[in-house]
Amino acid sequence: MARYFILAVALLLTACSSTSKKPIADDPFYAPVYPEAPPTKIAATGSIYQDSQAASLYSDIRAHKVGDIITIVLKEATQAKKSAGNQIKKGSDMSLDPIYAGGSNVSIGGVPLDLRYKDSMNTKRESDADQSNSLDGSISANVMQVLNNGNLVVRGEKWISINNGDEFIRVTGIVRSQDIKPDNTIDSTRMANARIQYSGTGTFADAQKVGWLSQFFMSDWWPF
């Protein structure tokens, strides 16, 4: 029996020690999309000015087609606070003094026999949770798709290698063309269905993770 118990505990610890797949750079999901431009024929006229390479001074530089680049300004701040508590009290008291049997008191050694029972229970639980996060910065992303209503699906990532680890930012979401500023930037708070991930890999990132044994004690499998 003890052998099966040890085997079950080992399986539970193995399950608790499993971690999600580590992110890698150059993920195909975040790979940029390059627009397919038709080949242009440049006539050799001998002039410095070429019509095929000209750009209007009054054209809109904001992203509007697949393959364009847009800068997302990260301005994220969240704060959550929650508290809960409950208290349960229960008690009972019973006494039978003296005890009668056959019309007379029941006694032992001349001492009247009585019965007393008293029980009480008091359970009190309190919990508090307070969490706040903030993220500031910027990241340039690609326009991956233009929807029928003109909204843009944007996606991009940025990797930074620092000493013994890598830090990365990944962003994906949907933006409105009207919300893009003249300098081709948009606040992250204006993105719909936004997915913003800021994390890292390496020695420093691993040091912040909880060990597998601590995960077991904090999981639902811990009976206490």
UniProtKB/Swiss-Prot annotation:
Signal peptide positions on this chain = 1-15
Q: How does it sit in the membrane?
A: Lipid-anchor
Identify the domain of life. Bacteria
Q: Where is the lipid attached (S-diacylglycerol cysteine)?
A: 16
Care to name a GO molecular-function term for this sequence?
cytoskeletal motor activity
- In its UniProt record, which GO terms are filed under biological process? bacterial-type flagellum-dependent cell motility
The protein's UniProt keywords, in alphabetical order, are:
Bacterial flagellum, Cell outer membrane, Lipoprotein, Membrane, Palmitate, Signal
**InterPro entries from the entry?**
Flag_Lring
Where does lipidation (N-palmitoyl cysteine) occur on this chain? Answer: 16
Q: Where in the cell is it found?
A: Cell outer membrane; Bacterial flagellum basal body
GO cellular component terms, semicolon-separated: bacterial-type flagellum basal body, distal rod, L ring; cell outer membrane
Which protein family is it in? Belongs to the FlgH family.
Q: What quaternary arrangement does the UniProt entry report?
A: The basal body constitutes a major portion of the flagellar organelle and consists of four rings (L,P,S, and M) mounted on a central rod.
Function field: Assembles around the rod to form the L-ring and probably protects the motor/basal body from shearing forces during rotation.
* Official protein name in the record: Flagellar L-ring protein
Please tell me the species this chain comes from: Shewanella sp. (strain MR-7)
Q: What is the lineage of its organism?
A: Bacteria, Pseudomonadati, Pseudomonadota, Gammaproteobacteria, Alteromonadales
